[in-house]
């Protein structure tokens, strides 16, 4: 049970100025060698009425002195018992540690609170872990002096590489530099990958410092070609990430901002990089900018990126229109067509034609149709000219999904044939019209009209097939004579011959 005195001590935040040393000792609010002790807020104490300490700092000092009474008081003031362990280690009070050992789940949890390397190592020793674990934790908590102390143990290149990469990941710059300059490491150039992955400029500069201190055997700084190649590779990776300042730092040491580098900036839509090197530095010719534009089409660059590249060309693309169309058709990304159409450069029709030629699915082409609001008759006529009957059927299934719509399709197609000039295209549509006819019911007059339609467009096969259906209809012979007149006027010998045969058997 708590005494009334304990409760008062725990919650008393203001000491009367009249309390002398004797009363403070009686209340348990006196700290030997330090003076009065009072709580001023949840995480701080007042010592001798003029020194403010955090509760945990006071706890550490008390533990280093072995003052269990003050420790107990500070713990009641919400101090962290981990600082008891830290203070006890500083003062070599292992008996005190033994009293609190049951509350400690893992000594590694205390390491982050320790500032002193000697105390850090003592604490780690209590966990009964090995030297490798100590070194890893020393990196994690930036204890360079521990690595320096145990340098003679760090002789394995593979393990040193792991430590180097860990230091880079943890962004412990002093340790990174020390390992790079002091220990044998397999792949010190991995620092550049980490710097780019984390977008860490400090790590990048350390990497170049190590490189030009000749600490990277994989790159010969005295071989200009090898150095330029490596630095250009860094520029390319930086362009992918959009790390503009990384590129400027790299260029201080060498490398070339070439087409491969800027193509990555286009692919990943890093316009700041493009604007700096193309507009300000003027490092590309018009032909190279055109190639970048085509690269952007290939890699699905955004509207803003494509607009930027087009602006460098003053939106003049006459010389590469054919290539633009080819790239769009090949890659299936028509963003550039949207951009150009806004600038009154219309490439919709040649691209649509190319999509049909390359057997793009109707689902894809439908996106294109919707984007540019293309009229259905234009799509069907183009598909008919190319003999893409399946695509026409898919299109009709999309806009006329019900069987009741077949008559509407029938009339629509007949009207298209009236306005179409392309002979092969007409044949495709007439073939489809006849298929629809076989699935719908027509009145006698409508069948005769269809027969006349076939004669007008010299559709001999469909004409013969329909004649078989009309043979027994009243008025068929007079109508055949009318059809014969049309065939003679238009000089359709096959239909003329077939009509004459039919008239013989009538």
Swiss-Prot record:
Keywords: Early protein
Stated induction or repression of this protein's expression: Expressed in the early phase of the viral replicative cycle.
Function: Plays a role in virus cell tropism, and may be required for efficient virus replication in macrophages.
Protein family according to the UniProt entry: Belongs to the asfivirus MGF 505 family.
Protein name: Protein MGF 505-4R
Organism (species): African swine fever virus (isolate Tick/Malawi/Lil 20-1/1983)
